[in-house]
Amino acid sequence: MTETRGARATEAFFGRRKGKPLRERQAAHLEHLLPLLKLDLEEPAPADLTALFPEPVERIRLEIGFGGGEHLIHRAAEDPATGFIGVEPFVNSMAKLLGQIEAKAIRNIRLYDDDATQVLDWLPAASVDQIDLLYPDPWPKRKHWKRRFVSQINLDRFARILKPGGLFCFASDIDSYINWTLIHCREHAAFEWTAERAADWLTPFAGWPSTRYEAKARREGRSSAYLAFRRA
């Protein structure tokens, strides 16, 4: 499948940027805490991404579109030896996560609050151990499918920054997006689907915390799929 990379101005995969008004403390977190944790893409990325973190880390994990932040906070708290980079353009979600980072004194998270493709293009080659794309916007209407984050162009980006043997993990409750991701990844030479049996993609990833998106899917009668692809 051949796709032409769009101009940066059109390369947006998210909808609204802000929802309900922020509380005073949330606004303060955005003003004072986010600048301390935000990646500076005006500067070259360090060759070794562990240098981005104040404490020693051994691995780097990128989560694109962390939403409510439940998964990112859970993973960062349970695995201090991993440095996490979280990307989320939605202001309210970022403000919520910053509050959790402060409350739990998390020190192994760095953040970016705009288009994830900017981060993907900034990161060095073969620098990331795992990429998580969990319950992304499915853009259900066919005319909007080109906005889905999973594309051959973005898989090229993933392939560039993942270390050999690194993982791309995807979760969704939308059948059309699950199939879309399987097709795109199986058409991409750099990725191998790790599943050997149905249980492998019907069972949540190891250490998986339940998220509000997953709970909403269950309430509405939808099951989720958990797909893992290894960088060849």
UniProtKB/Swiss-Prot annotation:
It holds the Pfam family Methyltransf_4. Keywords: Methyltransferase, S-adenosyl-L-methionine, Transferase, tRNA processing. Signal peptide: none annotated. It catalyses: guanosine(46) in tRNA + S-adenosyl-L-methionine = N(7)-methylguanosine(46) in tRNA + S-adenosyl-L-homocysteine. The keyword Transmembrane does not apply. Pathway: tRNA modification; N(7)-methylguanine-tRNA biosynthesis. GO terms for cellular component: tRNA methyltransferase complex. S-adenosyl-L-methionine binds at residues 63, 88, 115, 137. Catalyzes the formation of N(7)-methylguanine at position 46 (m7G46) in tRNA. This is tRNA (guanine-N(7)-)-methyltransferase. It comes from Rhizobium meliloti (strain 1021).
